[in-house]
Amino acid sequence: MNILIIFASYLLGSLPTGFLIGKYLKNIDLRTIGSGSTGATNVLRNVGKWPALFVFIIDVGKGFIAVKIAQYYTDQELIEVIAGISAISGHIWPIWLGGKGGKAVATGLGMFLALSWKVGLASLGIFLIVLTKTKFVSLSSISAAILLPIFMFFYLGEFIHTYFFISLIVALLVIWKHRTNITRLIKGEESKINQNQ
C-alpha cells in the first residue's frame, strides 16, 4: 500500500495543470516562453490572472491531497512526507512533459498545509509580505523557503523530527530551483510580478 501511495502521489504531482491551461487557452507551450516553468507565475505573465489563480489552487491541492491520502491510509510520518515529496517531484519533473515542470512552491505549500497548517500559513504569510513589498515572486518564494524550517522548528520544538528534516529538504530544493532567479536578482535583471521575462 505504501508503494502505491507514493507512486500515486508522484502521478498526482505530475498533472501538468499550467501546461494544459496554456495550451487550451492560448495554444502556447509554457516550457518554451517566459521562465520556462509551468507554474502559476509563468501562467500569470503569459495567459492571465484568473488562469494563474486556478493553476495555483490546483498545484497547492496536489501537495495537500497527496499528504492527506497518506495520512488516511497510514499513521507513519515517513510515508506522509515521502508522499508529499513525491508530489513535489512530480510537479518539478512531470513524466508527461519530459521532466520539465514547475518550481515546487505551490505544491510545497500544499504539502506543508497538510502536515501543519500553522507552518504552511506562516510561510504563505512571508511570501505575501515580501511580494507586497518587492513585487518579486522569486524573492518571495526564496524568503518563504528560508524561513520554512525555522517555522517548523518552532512548531515542533525540536530539530530531530521527520517534519523538520523534510522542511529543510524542501526549502533547499525550492532555493535550488530558483538559482537562475537568484543570479538575476543579484544582477538587477529579475522581472517583477507585473513584468514579462
Swiss-Prot record:
Superkingdom per UniProt: Bacteria
Membrane topology according to the record: Multi-pass membrane protein
GO molecular function, one term: acyl-phosphate glycerol-3-phosphate acyltransferase activity
Stretches that traverse the bilayer: 1-21, 78-98, 111-131, 136-155, 159-176
Native organism: Prochlorococcus marinus (strain MIT 9215)
Family matches, as InterPro entries: G3P_acylTferase_PlsY
Location in or out of the cell: Cell inner membrane
One GO process term, biological-process aspect: phospholipid biosynthetic process
Pathway field: Lipid metabolism; phospholipid metabolism
Entry keyword set: Cell inner membrane, Cell membrane, Lipid biosynthesis, Lipid metabolism, Membrane, Phospholipid biosynthesis, Phospholipid metabolism, Transferase, Transmembrane, Transmembrane helix
Known function: Catalyzes the transfer of an acyl group from acyl-phosphate (acyl-PO(4)) to glycerol-3-phosphate (G3P) to form lysophosphatidic acid (LPA). This enzyme utilizes acyl-phosphate as fatty acyl donor, but not acyl-CoA or acyl-ACP.
One term under GO cellular component: plasma membrane
Major place of residence: membrane
Subunit annotation: Probably interacts with PlsX.
Catalytic activity: an acyl phosphate + sn-glycerol 3-phosphate = a 1-acyl-sn-glycero-3-phosphate + phosphate
Family membership: Belongs to the PlsY family.
Gene: plsY
Protein name in UniProt: Glycerol-3-phosphate acyltransferase
Enzyme Commission code: 2.3.1.275
